[in-house]
Amino acid sequence: MSFIKDIFQKTTELSDAEFDYSITSDFNFIDSLNEDCTAIVMEATVVYFEIKNIPVLLKTGKRHAARVYKIYYNALHEICKHTGGFFNCYSPTSFLMIYPKEKFDLATVVNIAMKTADLISIGLREPIEKLCHNNFSIGVDHGNILGTKTLCNGKSNQIVWFGRTIEKAITISSLSQRPFFVGISSKVFHDLDESMTKTTKHILGIKKEVDVWTRMSYQFENVKKHLYQTNFHKSFDEEE
């Protein structure tokens, strides 16, 4: 059959071709990629957002699950536009928000993650909970990631991203102990100053300094690591 011959020829071309890539922090560079063997590599902070209850929602019907997914999609896409990040639909239950190092320091991205958690869990609670229990978690890590095009039109959410940074952010998100938690890697945590790691609370009328983040151990690629998680939120309203 001719289509099998065509597939074989294309597969052979791809397997023999050099996998070229360009190092950049400019997402507009995506327009110059093709669907064959070119990619971009960038150092960036990745915010991985997981809708925790899509598997449960699927039991009530595919349309219901897809409707909920679209609600989260719209909110996160608008947040990414507002904050200047790069938005990507990663899976039927998750999204990536990507912030290049050259334009965003780690503290800025952690602030965005905490504000996102606040907006989704509190600001959008009412419309979301008309449809479902609002249940998500966020994982954040920093490092090199590679993106390659899967379709010739090059839309951002049709770029496939690879990297240990993404895998670690996924693992951190999956270990969230409660809904709405933001988890960050130790690499990200140790880059934050005290204004991001400590806060003041009144306990029994006494003003006390408390930790914003709780440390926990986990295994990643058979190596013991630490992550830090919090349910302290910040608000986008603080920007106004």
Write out the residue ranges for each language-model feature.
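Catalytic/regulatory signature loops of cyclic-dinucleotide turnover enzymes
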Residues: 141, 164-188
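Intrinsically disordered, glycine/charged-rich C-terminal tails and inter-domain linkers
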Residues: 1-32, 177-240
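Short glycine-aspartate micro-motif
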Residues: 46, 135-139, 183
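Acidic, metal/cofactor-coordinating or nucleic-acid-engaging core segments within structured domains
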Residues: 112-115, 122-130, 181
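Structural signal for well-ordered, non-membrane alpha-helices
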Residues: 73, 77, 118-121, 125, ...
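Catalytic NTP-binding/metal-coordinating core of nucleotidyl cyclase/transferase enzymes
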Residues: 30-112
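Catalytic core of nucleotidyl cyclases, primarily class III adenylyl/guanylyl cyclases
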Residues: 83-109, 127-161
